[in-house]
Regions:
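Catalytic Walker B motif of ABC-type/P-loop ATPase nucleotide-binding domains
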Residues: 84-88
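ABC ATPase C-loop
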Residues: 76-77
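Conserved ABC ATPase signature
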Residues: 59-63, 67
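Conserved catalytic motifs of ABC-family nucleotide-binding domains
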Residues: 80
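Short, glycine/charged-rich "phosphate-handling" switch motifs in NTP-dependent
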Residues: 131, 143
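ABC-type ATPase nucleotide-binding domains, specifically the catalytic core motifs of the NBD
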Residues: 21-40, 48-53, 57, 144, ...
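Helical segment within the ABC ATPase nucleotide-binding domain
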Residues: 98-111
Length: 163
């Protein structure tokens, strides 16, 4: 699936705690054999997340939750995915880091990547999404343009704490 351009950023980050930041990133490029391409991708990740560059020799397990989320996203980007599946990227993060992660999601999308975002923070998800789907007990109950969903009274009451 990764070879087809579909890469997953899992819920709970699932980094390799005993490997360094740099080693975690390199594992993300496991399908790439060209060391120059791998280095270029690492540099792109470090530009997106300068904190990871500062911590590149640090073990992944010693990073904060926000840094681990950056690493999980960076590892996925090492595959140069066309479609990025992100599962609960804001889970367990401080509000300032949640905002930063969502800024990165928007930036990646603006650069041409398709992002499928599963997120319980409906307000932020609808702010960055083009389209939204509301699920209840595994069934799609509402869908449409994100702005329309954000303005829907049912969605506002049930998921956005309004009304």
């Amino acid at each position: 699936v990764a070879a087809l351009g579909l890469v997953h950023v899992p819920e709970g980050r699932r980094i390799f705690p005993r490997l360094t930041v740099e080693e975690n990133l390199e594992i993300g490029a496991y399908l790439e054999n060209d060391r120059k391409v791998i280095q270029e991708r690492k540099e792109q990740v470090y530009q997106l997340f300068p904190r990871l560059y500062e911590r590149r020799q640090q073990k992944g397990g010693t990073l904060s939750g926000g840094e681990q989320q950056m690493l999980a996203i960076g590892r996925a980007l090492m595959q140069n995915p066309r479609i990025l599946l992100m599962d609960e990227p804001s889970m367990g993060l401080a509000p300032v880091l949640v905002d930063f992660i969502f800024e990165i999601v928007q930036k990646l999308n603006q650069e041409g990547r398709t992002i499928l975002l599963v997120e319980q923070n409906a307000r932020l998800a609808l702010q960055v999404a083009h389209r939204g789907y509301v699920l209840a007990t595994g069934e799609i109950i509402l869908y449409g343009p994100a702005r329309e969903l954000a303005e829907n009274p049912e969605v506002q009451k049930a998921y956005l704490g309004e009304g």
